[in-house]
Amino acid sequence: MSEKNPIVGLCQKASFLISAAQVDQCPPDEGLEVAFAGRSNAGKSSALNTLTHANLARTSKTPGRTQLLNFFALDDSRRLVDLPGYGYAKVPIPLKQHWQRHLEAYLSSRASLAGVFLMMDIRHPLTDFDRLMLDWAQASQLPIHVLMTKADKLAFGAAKNALLKVRREVQQGWGDVATLQLFSAPKRQGVDEAQMVLAQWLGLLDEEQEAFEEA
C-alpha cells in the first residue's frame, strides 16, 4: 500500500520552509497544509518520520525551533506543519498562555489547514492537552485524526480495548470532527491507514482519480 500511496514520494521531497512563533509569521495562507500535534513523549516525532519516510522531526528539534510551528514544503501548494510538543503540565504558566493563544489562533484562522493529526500515547490517552486540541478542532470544525501511538506497548487485546474505550468518549464529545486508529511506528502498525488520511487531506487522492478518469 505504501508504495502506491502518492504521499510517500511527495514527502521524500519535503524541505524545511520556515519556523513561526505566531500566525503572522506563517507562510501565505494558500494551498493545503496538514499539522501534527502531540504532547511531549506521545510519539509525535516517530509518527511524523514514519508516515513521511523522512526525518522531518529532526529539523523541528534543532535549537530554537522546539517551541515554534515548523513548516515543511512538499510542493508549491502543499505543506506539513510540526506543532510544538510541550510537556504540557510542566511549562511555566506565561509560556503556556503564550503557546495556547498563538496555537489556537493558528488552528482557527488558517484557511489552508485541511486537518490535524493528534498523537496520543495509548497508555495515557485524553490528557488535558489532548482534550484542548479536540476542543479547538471542534470549535473550528477542523478534521482531526487521532493516532493512538505506542500500540505495540500493549497486548493486542488490551490495545483494541483501549481504542474502543477512547473512541466511545471521543465520539460522544467530538465525534463530528474526530476519527481514531491504533498506531505503532516501530511495528509500522496503522501506517497505511494514516497515510491514506494524509493523502486525502492533501488532495492527492482526488488528483489520482482525475488522472484515472482522464486516462
Curated annotation (Swiss-Prot):
Give GO MF terms, alphabetically. Answer: GTP binding; metal ion binding
Could you tell me what this protein does?
Necessary for normal cell division and for the maintenance of normal septation.
Query: Binding positions for GTP?
Result: 38-45, 64-68, 82-85, 149-152, 182-185
The UniProt entry, under PANTHER family, shows: ENGB-TYPE G DOMAIN-CONTAINING PROTEIN, MSS1/TRME-RELATED GTP-BINDING PROTEIN
Domain of life per record: Bacteria
Q: Which CDD domains match?
A: YihA_EngB (cd01876)
- Domain called EngB-type G: residue spans: 30-204
Identify the cofactor(s). Answer: Mg(2+)
Which lineage?
Answer: Bacteria, Pseudomonadati, Pseudomonadota, Gammaproteobacteria, Pseudomonadales
Fetch the SUPFAM superfamilies from UniProt.
P-loop containing nucleoside triphosphate hydrolases
By sequence similarity, the record places it as follows: Belongs to the TRAFAC class TrmE-Era-EngA-EngB-Septin-like GTPase superfamily. EngB GTPase family.
**Any one of the GO BP annotations:** division septum assembly
For binding Mg(2+), which residues are annotated in this chain's numbering?
45, 66
Name of protein: Probable GTP-binding protein EngB
Organism of provenance: Pseudomonas aeruginosa (strain ATCC 15692 / DSM 22644 / CIP 104116 / JCM 14847 / LMG 12228 / 1C / PRS 101 / PAO1)
A single GO CC term for this protein reads: cytosol
The alphabetical list of record keywords is:
Cell cycle, Cell division, GTP-binding, Magnesium, Metal-binding, Nucleotide-binding, Septation
